[in-house]
């Protein structure tokens, strides 16, 4: 592994442990040339997922796009970044476990909204307003009514 400080390729591993619920390995390393310490993460290389966009274009799944959208939607809601990252990890895992390698962007958006509805109504409405292209107050009201209807259905089942 190349040292970020001096670019030397000789380093030793000081510590290794599982990260991201066992989906990656976190390693603390020390450069043998300059003694700089740094952290690396190893993940299993997965087959890329292709996202079918609304306009018909195809692009490779980009987890950072979802995480950025979630971060913006969750600002000042009290939801921590770690929880959002876990949510994106879970979403990516669900997509990887599918038999097909292509997924509609609409399906990804709905998966995100399902998770957000359980976490924060404010974040749900913010994300939905961008994702579903809300045009006015009626769209916001309909989204909130949808959340409450789903919660009532879940309560009736339990």
UniProtKB/Swiss-Prot annotation:
A GO term, aspect molecular function: DNA binding
GO terms classed as biological process: negative regulation of DNA-templated transcription
Annotated signal peptide: none
Cofactor section: Zn(2+)
ZnF (unnamed) intervals: 3-34
UniProt KW keywords: ATP-binding, DNA-binding, Metal-binding, Nucleotide-binding, Repressor, Transcription, Transcription regulation, Zinc, Zinc-finger
InterPro entries per record: ATP-cone_dom, NrdR-like_N, RNR_NrdR-like
Cofactor binding, per record: Binds 1 zinc ion.
Name of one Pfam family that matches: ATP-cone
Record flagged with keyword Cytoplasm: no
Record PROSITE patterns: ATP_CONE
Domain ATP-cone: 49-139
HAMAP family cross-referenced by the UniProt entry: NrdR (MF_00440)
Alphabetized NCBIfam families for the sequence: transcriptional regulator NrdR (TIGR00244)
Role description: Negatively regulates transcription of bacterial ribonucleotide reductase nrd genes and operons by binding to NrdR-boxes.
Family as reported in the entry's similarity comment: Belongs to the NrdR family.
Entries under PANTHER family matching the protein: TRANSCRIPTIONAL REPRESSOR NRDR (PTHR30455:SF2)
Name of the featured protein: Transcriptional repressor NrdR
Classification lineage: Bacteria, Bacillati, Cyanobacteriota, Cyanophyceae, Synechococcales
